[in-house]
Amino acid sequence: MELQLFGINHKTSNVSDRERFIINESNQFLLNTLIKDKYKNIIFSFFGLSTCNRSEIYILGKKGVIKSFFEEASKLFYLNEINISQFYFLQDEDAFIHMCKVAAGIDSQVLGEQEIFGQYKNAITLSKSIGVMDSNLQRYANKAIEVVRKVRTNTNIGVNPLSISGLSLKLIKNIFENPIDQKILVIGAGSLAQDVIKNLYNKGVRDIRAVNRSVKEIIISDSFGIVSSPLSTLHS
């Protein structure tokens, strides 16, 4: 058995392509069915991780199976529309090192950001709860958690606790003396955009407008009182 992975992230692809490949609970059920149908006794366990900036699938299986699994997963999720050069494939020690870097925030857009660690642990919890991660893969995942804790204890990597959304708020504060008096436009409807809006709202900013390609895709709590509109109205 060998730890292997394939993924796509902010370094290899643009936002629109990353949005095509989301690993949620239902998609993991589909992957599990695929494995049972075509990779029985070849792939033994897996888990998926999706954040604003990456989607990755980690597997424990026979050596060299990751490319074949990617091809089948591509058919399942229509990933053929994305150029294969935007994906990366890692195996064995390289896969584990990458897992540790991701969980520690070393591979993040904001070096050392802490949000990814929680997302990583949530992904593990979900995969365990739906029965797609076995004890062998869990050992790798738990070992990565140990590594992250040592890294954050023994280095300065965790000194900056900010996420992308936190940095956005910090930048606004640096530019405007009174951020709560400003009119803020947020472009996008993903989890990152929603985190930015929540942070702004919690800091007292009330005049917020959110635009996206489709207004139907903007899902924000009504309690925020956000004005939502499609991207076509940006200049209106």
Regions found by a protein language model. Name each.
Residues 1-108:
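A glycine-rich (often HGG/GG-containing) alpha/beta subdomain
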Residues 69, 196, 220:
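Short glycine-/acidic-enriched loop or helix-start segments at secondary-structure transitions
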Residues 222-236:
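Short acidic low-complexity segments
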Residues 65, 215-220:
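Short, charged/polar "capping" segments at the starts of alpha-helices
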Residues 144, 160-213:
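Glycine-rich adenosine-cofactor-binding loop
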Residues 45, 207, 225-227:
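Conserved beta-strand segments of alpha/beta enzyme cores
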Residues 35, 200-201, 221:
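Hydrophobic alpha-helical packing residues
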Residues 82-180:
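Glycine/serine-rich phosphate-binding loop and adjoining beta1-alpha1 elements at the start
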